């Protein structure tokens, strides 16, 4: 059985999220007379990861920790010149006191963002870049705030790519585990298929400030790429969150709370138009006002 851990300072974390939520994401005054081309859907490809199977380490339940799970959604809606315009939202879930403790769920957004276009980058690449920025910004805001107790866990959807040595040093000093869990990642199928039943992990690389692993969080759970600054944090995760089909429930809740509705997407386009942008096609007024029974994110 895991040991009891101090509870998260929920009001302090809530104030951080609320402050992040109120930050100005886009100076809409600069849109006047800008001609925006409204975008259609397009699926992107995840980053490639090669699994080098090594020794498989079994996981047992560890320390009961307070955890924060962060996920986001971003939808490209328009472009002009060399800029993408996206609407995004983030979900933040706090769980303290063990796997079955009631979660606190917060939502950031929806907000508009302007992202400079990189050479060869498509709209889904821009959306991934924005999601990484939003989730990473919230993660680092919480990490550097001092609002966390020892042995806290911060979970984000996706990898920990871009994490600096300074951030890792702060996490180690605060005894906080940063954990990135990728739902979709290109791996060698035969290698992932041969991953033993969990819970456990095999290290792919451990030469930076965080380890990259191929892991199962329950016996027959879906194999995942999991990045972590502290491998012991994976044991704490098993004691601190419900694992559903091999995936942490708190991250699942964060994902659902970040999903953007079609009416929110249409409202974002309306906001662009209200600030002087010339759209390439007229908006559907009924959908903008009422929405339809469909979600994206």
What function would you assign to each model-found segment?
Residues 65-75:
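Two-metal-ion RNase H-like nuclease active-site motif
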Residues 1-60, 65, 117-297:
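Long, contiguous domain-sized segments
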Residues 74-113:
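Acidic, metal-ligating active-site segments
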């Amino acid at each position: 059985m895991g040991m009891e851990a101090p509870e998260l300072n929920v009001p302090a974390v809530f104030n951080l999220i609320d402050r992040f939520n109120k930050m100005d994401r886009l100076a809409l005054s600069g849109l006047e007379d800008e001609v925006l081309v409204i975008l259609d859907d397009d699926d992107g490809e995840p980053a490639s990861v090669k699994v080098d199977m090594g020794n498989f380490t079994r996981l047992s339940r560890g320390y009961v920790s307070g955890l924060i799970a962060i996920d986001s959604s971003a939808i490209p809606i328009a472009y002009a010149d060399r800029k993408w315009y996206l609407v995004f939202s983030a979900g933040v879930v706090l769980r303290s006191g063990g796997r079955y403790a009631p979660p606190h769920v917060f939502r950031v957004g929806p907000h508009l963002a302007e992202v400079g276009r990189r050479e060869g980058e498509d709209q889904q690449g821009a959306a991934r870049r924005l999601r990484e920025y939003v989730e990473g910004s919230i993660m680092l805001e919480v990490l550097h705030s001092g609002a966390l107790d020892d042995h806290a866990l911060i979970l984000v959807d996706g990898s920990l790519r871009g994490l600096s040595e300074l951030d890792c040093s702060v996490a180690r000093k605060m005894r906080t585990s940063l954990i990135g869990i990728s739902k979709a990642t290109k791996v060698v199928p035969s290698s992932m298929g041969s991953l033993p039943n969990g819970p456990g992990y095999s290290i792919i690389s451990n030469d930076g400030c965080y380890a990259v692993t191929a892991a199962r969080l329950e016996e027959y759970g879906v194999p995942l790429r999991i990045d972590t600054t502290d491998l012991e944090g994976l044991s704490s995760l098993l004691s601190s969150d419900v694992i559903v089909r091999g995936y942490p429930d708190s991250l699942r809740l964060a994902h659902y709370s970040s999903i953007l509705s079609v009416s929110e997407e249409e409202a974002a386009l309306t906001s662009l138009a209200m600030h002087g942008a010339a759209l390439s096609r007229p908006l559907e007024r009924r959908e903008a006002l009422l929405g339809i029974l469909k979600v994206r994110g």
